[in-house]
């Protein structure tokens, strides 16, 4: 079972994500990032590719899409905060966004 990030694992997993634009969500043990694409088709295509990985890993983002902008929040509800799954999905999102 996935566990909430410990103090020891939090820094090494999250610092590279912060360097790529991810931020902590105020008042929650969650991270967020806004992705902006050239147009709606690119944004929705990216969301579709992410959804395939999210389903494969059974870990789903909180997200919304307006035209070419996608706002993402990641947390693991089962553990009440951030887990390795969030870091893994964030890295995948970054790589798929190019």
Curated annotation (Swiss-Prot):
Tell me the InterPro entries matching this sequence.
PCD_sf, Pterin_deHydtase
Judging by the UniProt lineage, the source's domain of life is: Bacteria
Q: What is its EC number?
A: 4.2.1.96
Catalytic activity entry:
(4aS,6R)-4a-hydroxy-L-erythro-5,6,7,8-tetrahydrobiopterin = (6R)-L-erythro-6,7-dihydrobiopterin + H2O
A GO MF annotation of the entry reads:
4-alpha-hydroxytetrahydrobiopterin dehydratase activity
Gene3D superfamilies associated with the record: Transcriptional coactivator/pterin dehydratase (3.30.1360.20)
Q: Specify whether Lyase is a keyword of the entry.
A: yes
Alphabetical GO biological process terms: tetrahydrobiopterin biosynthetic process
Q: What are the UniProt keywords, alphabetically? A: Lyase
User: Pfam families of this UniProt entry?
Assistant: Pterin_4a (PF01329)
What enzyme class is recorded for this protein? Answer: lyase
UniProt family annotation: Belongs to the pterin-4-alpha-carbinolamine dehydratase family.
Q: What is this protein called?
A: Putative pterin-4-alpha-carbinolamine dehydratase
Source species: Roseobacter denitrificans (strain ATCC 33942 / OCh 114)
Lineage, opening ranks: Bacteria, Pseudomonadati, Pseudomonadota, Alphaproteobacteria, Rhodobacterales
């Amino acid at each position: 079972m996935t566990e909430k990030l410990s103090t020891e694992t939090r820094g090494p997993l999250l610092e590279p994500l912060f360097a790529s634009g991810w931020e902590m969500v105020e008042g929650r043990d969650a991270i967020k990032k806004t992705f902006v694409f050239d147009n709606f088709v690119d944004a929705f295509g990216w969301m579709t590719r992410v959804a395939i990985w999210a389903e494969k890993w059974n870990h789903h983002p909180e997200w919304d899409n307006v035209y070419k902008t996608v706002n993402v929040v990641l947390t693991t509800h089962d553990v009440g905060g951030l887990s390795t799954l969030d870091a893994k999905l964030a890295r995948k999102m970054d790589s798929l966004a190019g």
